[in-house]
Amino acid sequence: CHTGWLKSAGMLMPMGYMIGNGLVDVQGPADEIESLRTTIEAHFDNASIPSSGDLYYGYSGAFNCLTQGVGDVAFAKTSSYEDHCEGNDWCLDRDQYRILEPHFGQVPSHPVIVNPDNAGDKQDALIAALLALNTDEGGVDILENVLNTPGLIPVTSESHLGSYSDAIENIPGITAYFEAKYDD
């Protein structure tokens, strides 16, 4: 049960890890993104690859897909039970679920990115204002309730992406897909 087509934690990270470690063989041309779908379907038989709005879409959907017996494994968060089972009668008892090893790595959060054209004083002021949210009572509320994060920290692209880049480079056609998508 995947979270959705080309979703980071529910598809790209685990499939990139498994392909890169020789656990799954790529089916189809290595430079076409649809080879990923073919690879998943060949390896997992009845894989659930939902689209936005489908019953099993997202983290809750992947966990529900597993719970309903649609799939044998869900690529979701380790906190899925806590995140999705309170008040949901579709969940099984906690001891009916088992987290499998290895953890595939950590998918980076959604970053706040500063426009490089705003270099210098303007960029520094913007970064300082965003980081000030960490220490301001109203700022903490904004971080938690609007941005859904406990805080902001400055990072480089390399440190932010970490092992994620290594894993997704194994996805067939991913480079061509993103080049075509963002080459405007």
Outline where the language-model segments fall.
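Bilobed "Venus flytrap"/periplasmic-binding protein-like clamshell domains
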Residues: 1-63, 68, 141, 149-150, ...
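Structural recognition of the beta-strand scaffold that forms the well-ordered cores
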Residues: 1-2, 72-76, 113
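Solvent-exposed loop/turn segments at secondary-structure junctions
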Residues: 5-9, 79-82, 117-120
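A ligand-binding cleft/hinge motif common to bilobed small-molecule-binding domains
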Residues: 17-20, 59-95
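Residue-level marker of positions within ordered structural domains that often coincide
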Residues: 23, 71, 117, 131
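Periplasmic-binding protein-like
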Residues: 25-50, 85-127, 149
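An extracytoplasmic/periplasmic, membrane-proximal ligand-sensing/linker region
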Residues: 119-184
